[in-house]
Curated annotation (Swiss-Prot):
<comment type="similarity">
    <text>Belongs to the TRAFAC class myosin-kinesin ATPase superfamily. Kinesin family. Kinesin subfamily.</text>
</comment>
<dbReference type="GO" id="GO:0007052">
    <property type="term" value="P:mitotic spindle organization"/>
</dbReference>
<dbReference type="GO" id="GO:0003777">
    <property type="term" value="F:microtubule motor activity"/>
</dbReference>
<dbReference type="GO" id="GO:0005875">
    <property type="term" value="C:microtubule associated complex"/>
</dbReference>
<dbReference type="GO" id="GO:0007018">
    <property type="term" value="P:microtubule-based movement"/>
</dbReference>
<dbReference type="GO" id="GO:0005524">
    <property type="term" value="F:ATP binding"/>
</dbReference>
<keyword id="KW-0547">Nucleotide-binding</keyword>
<dbReference type="InterPro" id="IPR027417">
    <property type="entry name" value="P-loop_NTPase"/>
</dbReference>
<feature type="region of interest" description="Disordered">
    <location>
        <begin position="898"/>
        <end position="935"/>
    </location>
</feature>
<dbReference type="GO" id="GO:0005737">
    <property type="term" value="C:cytoplasm"/>
</dbReference>
<dbReference type="InterPro" id="IPR001752">
    <property type="entry name" value="Kinesin_motor_dom"/>
</dbReference>
<dbReference type="InterPro" id="IPR027640">
    <property type="entry name" value="Kinesin-like_fam"/>
</dbReference>
<keyword id="KW-0493">Microtubule</keyword>
<feature type="region of interest" description="Disordered">
    <location>
        <begin position="400"/>
        <end position="419"/>
    </location>
</feature>
<comment type="function">
    <text>Kinesin is a microtubule-associated force-producing protein that may play a role in organelle transport. Its motor activity is directed toward the microtubule's plus end. The speed of this motor is 4-5 times faster than its animal counterparts.</text>
</comment>
<dbReference type="InterPro" id="IPR036961">
    <property type="entry name" value="Kinesin_motor_dom_sf"/>
</dbReference>
<dbReference type="InterPro" id="IPR019821">
    <property type="entry name" value="Kinesin_motor_CS"/>
</dbReference>
Length: 935
């Protein structure tokens, strides 16, 4: 090292793709000796001197061998050491400290090489030296100290005392026994470190990381101990926001990083300017932790990482100036040694001897002073001096009271014998200690098993607690649902009571209305019966007139009577001339009359067919009239409902008499309608009578015709035969006449039957037609009445108003009586509702009181559960911390190491180091033999 100053090493990395893309070119020139560089920038041109300058293609091993190797040796010898890596973001600090791959011999960084160097130095040390190595890993993120080996420990405090100096309280320190264990610690810690992407670096460190190695050295023979701390600091890079593109959380991190680096620069300025009386270590947690490394008890190496490109000229110049200032810092490094028991005893003996000498000197001086005070004199040769006291020349000194010779004191009691142990006794002590260590290992194994069992029991208890919580939660849900259902049930019961009261009141009102309705129905039926009796006679008369008028149009009695007379004359003629012989002309005339009679019968048959067709037409007309009647009745009902609705709408604010007036008006309209219908029925009856008389006339004509036909047939049968010459012809003619007579008689009989049937059917159809016409006329009259009534609403309203005024005086008393009765009913109803509501209020108050009690109990339970949850949370946190330590596979038990391949248990000859704390706990060598030897 160059004196006791900080060693500053400068390292340049090659240009990256961003710098090449932006047109950057190298602007540095390193001299052949590697201690000076020239910066050829646009803003600044000049030289910088450092302890060593490494170019862009320098290997990791070369940087380590020159810069760091000696510091590791000093730390193992008991000195404190610090290695800084400083530079802008993306300048290669993390690559220098950690490397690309800690398992690659070429690219692994300074920290892996330091780890290997530490254990190599331990292995190369004498066998009587025992070493323990502890590792801790922390980061300073957003000005908060965070333990990377125990991420749950955040914002750790920084303390200071006389023995420890500045330290981080609560920082986890792990004992390690091999490089693999250190690498595992480094991997675990690096995984917890905060990194982020920026435009300058894809994995930019967002915090300062510090790896601290504590190496303790003990001489097992003498008991002397030394300890050294090695700080490996990877600083986060200084950032220019314009280049990194930081924003949001990354921007806040950049602010904190630049703040701590500024505080570091202020500390260096205060240490180097020679004028500052105060060094601002407390301005940043970084400078506070590294207080001993900057101007204190430490041997420090600062590695400044720079970019050679003109693209980052300003950042490179700032970094070089920082390193140049730091180079002038002077540290005061010393060995951190603990005195051995022998050295402490010698020091104690020396101090005791000096104390006795001073006491003797004080006593001699007091004696000389007493002589002078008594007026005596002391010769100059007997004056008290320190040299005489030191030499033990007490004869020439004046006597002093209380003075005792130290020699007599020394001989007054024998010295305590110092026991000396033989080699076999020392081996026995070591063997006993190893046995105790084995027992400790067994106890630790048993403790581990017990902890596992306890953990399983805790998990089981946690499971049961979760089950209990789920059951409790379900119970609470069911309880709440039950409470809600109870409330709903009570609400329903209360509503049912109110509904029952309302139903009772409605029943009473319904009974009153039913009684009134029965009375109205009775009055209406009486009025209908009276009106019906009055209109039945008129309707029958009208119906008879219409039937007579209708049947008169179908009276064929004249024609039938003429033909009947002709047929009867022919038959009479036949009867009168039975004894005479008929001539040919008579027979021809008779046949002609028979043919005419047959034609007349056919004509009447056709007439009957026409009547049948008319009957069918009347049936169709009947159906049509029935449809029209239904439509008119429907329209009448709709119009009536509309009229009633309008009347009710207009009567909302009127008196109750309006309803009576409307009922009276409707009854009058109904009576008028019944009267009109009765008149139409009477007309139809009269028409039916007329048709019946016509039918009787037709039947009489048919009877006459049949009689004439019979007479004619008889006359023909009584006609005598002609001469013998015409006998055959007459016989044939008689047969024809007989057939004709029979045919006419049969036709007359059929005609009579048909006439009767037709007349019955015609009479029935006429009755139906008359009834339909009467109904149609009645409906038309009702429709016209409704139209007239709707057109005269104003007059009807006036009449109703007058009627209401007339009836108002008579109904006042009735209204008052009804109002009084209704008020009494309402009072009773209100009293019942009030009683029900009071019961409801009392039940609700009881439920409220119960709910408050339950709420208090639930609050107490909740507080208890909250306390339990907090306890479990604390247990979980502690368990998490323990799990993180268990994940590292390490323990807090020290792992002593010895050099020259000496086995720690004094029983193995292979110099292998422990690789894991599970490989039979490392036995610590005893310090007792050395203590005994020092005695």
């Amino acid at each position: 090292m160059s004196g006791n100053n900080i060693k500053v090493v400068c390292r340049f990395r090659p240009q990256n793709s961003l710098e090449i893309r932006e047109g950057g070119t190298p602007i540095i020139d390193i001299d052949p000796e590697g201690t000076q560089l020239e910066l050829k920038g646009k803003e600044f041109k000049g030289n910088f001197n450092f302890d060593k300058v490494f170019g862009m293609n320098t290997a990791q091993k070369d940087v380590f061998d020159y810069s760091i190797k000696t510091i590791v040796d000093d730390v193992t010898a008991g000195y404190n050491g610090t290695v800084f890596a400083y530079g802008q973001t993306g300048s290669g600090k993390t690559f220098t400290m950690m490397g690309a791959d800690i398992d690659d011999e070429k690219t692994k960084g300074i920290i892996p090489r330091i780890v290997e160097q530490i254990f190599d130095s331990i292995m190369a040390s004498p066998s009587n030296l025992e070493f323990t190595v502890k590792v801790s890993y922390m980061e300073i993120y957003m000005e908060k100290v965070r333990d990377l080996l125990n991420p749950s420990s955040e914002n750790l405090p920084i303390h200071e005392d006389k023995t420890k100096g500045v330290y981080v309280k609560g920082l986890l320190e792990v004992y390690v026994g091999s490089t693999d264990e250190v690498y595992e610690v480094m991997r675990r810690g690096s995984n917890n470190r905060v990194v982020a992407y920026t435009n300058m670096n894809a994995e930019s460190s967002r915090s300062h990381s510090i790896v601290m190695f504590t190496i303790t050295q003990k001489n097992v023979d003498t008991g002397a101990a030394k300890s050294g701390k090695l700080y490996l600091v990877d600083l986060a890079g200084s950032e220019k926001v314009g280049k990194t593109g930081a924003s949001g959380q990354t921007l806040e991190e950049a602010k904190k990083i630049n703040k701590s680096l500024t505080a570091l620069g202020m500390v260096i300025n205060a240490l180097t300017d020679g004028k500052s009386s105060h060094v601002p270590y407390r301005d940043s947690k970084l400078t506070r932790i590294l207080q001993e490394s900057l101007g204190g008890n430490s041997r420090t190496t600062l590695i400044i990482n720079c970019s050679p490109s003109s693209y980052n000229e300003a950042e490179t110049l700032s970094t070089l100036r920082f390193g140049a200032r730091a180079k002038s810092i002077k540290n005061k490094a010393k060995v951190n040694a603990d005195l051995s028991p022998a050295e402490l005893k010698a020091l104690l003996k020396k101090v005791k001897s000096e104390a006795v000498t001073y006491q003797t000197y004080i006593a001699a001086l007091e004696g000389e002073v007493n002589v002078w005070r008594t007026g005596g004199t002391v010769p100059e040769g007997k004056w008290v001096t320190m040299d005489k006291v030191s030499k033990g020349d007490f004869a020439g000194l004046p006597p002093a009271p209380g003075f005792k010779s130290p020699v007599s004191d020394e001989g007054s009691r024998p010295a305590t014998p110092v026991p000396t142990l033989e080699k076999d006794e020392r081996e026995e002590f070591i063997k006993r200690e190893n046995e105790l260590m084995d027992q400790i290992s067994e106890k630790e194994t048993e403790l581990t098993n017990r902890e596992k069992l306890l953990e399983s029991l805790r998990e089981e208890m946690g499971y049961y607690k979760e089950q209990e919580q789920s059951v409790t939660k379900e119970n609470q849900q069911m309880t709440s649902e039950l409470s809600e259902l109870r409330l709903q049930l009570q609400k329903v019961s209360y509503e049912s009571k109110e509904n029952a009261i309302t139903v009772d009141s409605l029943k009473e009102a319904n009974q009153d209305l039913m009684a009134e309705l029965e009375e109205l129905k009775k009055n209406l039926s009486e009025m209908r019966q009276a009106h019906k009796d009055a209109t039945d006679s008129d309707k029958e008369k009208r119906k008879a007139e219409k039937m007579a008028q209708m049947m008169s149009g179908f009276d064929p009695s004249g024609i039938l009577n003429d033909k009947e007379r002709q047929i009867r004359n022919a038959l009479s003629k036949l009867d009168g001339e039975q004894q005479q012989t008929l001539t040919v002309e008579d027979l021809v005339s008779l046949r002609r009359e028979l043919a005419e009679s047959k034609m007349l019968v056919e004509q009447h048959t056709k007439t009957i067919s026409d009547l049948s067709a008319d009957k069918d037409a009347m049936e169709a007309k009947k159906i049509e009239l029935e449809g029209r009647l239904g439509a008119l009745e429907k329209e009448y009902e709709e119009l009536l409902d509309k009229t009633i609705a309008e009347e009710e709408a207009n009567m909302q604010n009127a008196d109750v008499d309006n309803l009576s007036a409307l009922k009276t008006k409707l009854e009058a309209q109904y009576a008028e309608k019944k009267e009109v219908q009765q008149k139409e029925i009477d007309d139809l009856k009269r028409e039916l009578d007329r048709k019946q008389s016509g039918h009787e006339k037709l039947s009489a004509a048919m009877t006459d015709l049949r009689a004439a036909n019979d007479q004619l047939q008889a006359a023909l049968s009584e006609q005598p035969f002609q001469a013998p010459q015409d006998n055959s012809d007459m016989t044939e003619k008689e047969k024809d006449i007989e057939r004709t007579r029979k045919s006419m008689a049969q036709q007359l009989a059929d005609f009579e039957v048909m006439k009767k049937a037709l007349m019955r059917d015609l009479q029935n159809r006429c009755e139906k037609v008359v009834e339909l016409e009467m109904s149609l006329d009645e409906t038309r009259e009702q429709y016209n009445n409704v139209l007239r009534a709707s057109n005269n609403k104003a007059q009807q309203k006036k009449m109703a108003f007058l009627e209401r005024n007339l009836e108002q005086l008579t109904n006042v008393q009735k209204q008052l009586v009804e109002q009084n009765a209704s008020l009494k009913k309402e009072v009773a109803l209100a009293e019942r509702k009030l009683i029900a509501r009071n019961e409801r209020i009392q039940s609700l108050e009881t439920l409220l009181h119960n709910a408050q009690d339950k709420l208090l109990n639930q609050n107490k339970k909740f507080e208890q559960q909250l306390a339990t949850v907090r306890e479990r949370l604390e247990q979980a946190r502690s368990q998490k911390s323990q799990n993180s330590l268990a994940a590292l596979n390490f323990s807090r038990i020290a792992k002593p190491l010895r050099g020259n391949g000496a086995a720690i248990d004094n029983g193995s000859d292979d110099g292998s180091l422990p690789t894991s704390p599970t490989d039979k706990r490392d036995k610590r060598s005893s310090w007792m033999p050395g203590f005994m030897n020092s005695r």
